[in-house]
Amino acid sequence: MRNYETLFILNPSLDEEATKAAIEKFKGVIEKEGGVVENVDEWGRRKLAYPINKVNEGYYTLINFKANPELPRELERVFRITDGVMRFMVVNPEK
């Protein structure tokens, strides 16, 4: 298993319950595919460097996890089809 981290930005118009549900959904995808979530760091609402779809703020969350090399592709697919995700990135911090 390799170490990965994902940082994603959720639309700030989501209420707190929807934000928590989205984070749990992504953690569930990682665990369902055989990964292990090591740390979830919610940075909260922050100003974006530039507007995305006329939105100036976003809800940032960082998840560190261990997984097989196939899992990041599935996680990215889920990010793309989930409403409310403005930006995301999955990286291997060792490289």
UniProtKB/Swiss-Prot annotation:
GO BP of this protein: translation
InterPro entries from the UniProt entry: Ribosomal_bS6, Ribosomal_bS6_sf, Ribosomal_S6_plastid/chlpt, Transl_elong_EF1B/ribsomal_bS6
PANTHER family noted in UniProt: MITOCHONDRIAL 28S RIBOSOMAL PROTEIN S6 (PTHR21011), SMALL RIBOSOMAL SUBUNIT PROTEIN BS6M (PTHR21011:SF1)
Name of the featured protein: Small ribosomal subunit protein bS6
Recorded family membership: Belongs to the bacterial ribosomal protein bS6 family.
Organism encoding this protein: Clostridium novyi (strain NT)
Source lineage: Bacteria, Bacillati, Bacillota, Clostridia, Eubacteriales
Record-level GO cellular component terms: cytoplasm; ribonucleoprotein complex; ribosome
Keywords: Ribonucleoprotein, Ribosomal protein, RNA-binding, rRNA-binding
Stated role: Binds together with bS18 to 16S ribosomal RNA.
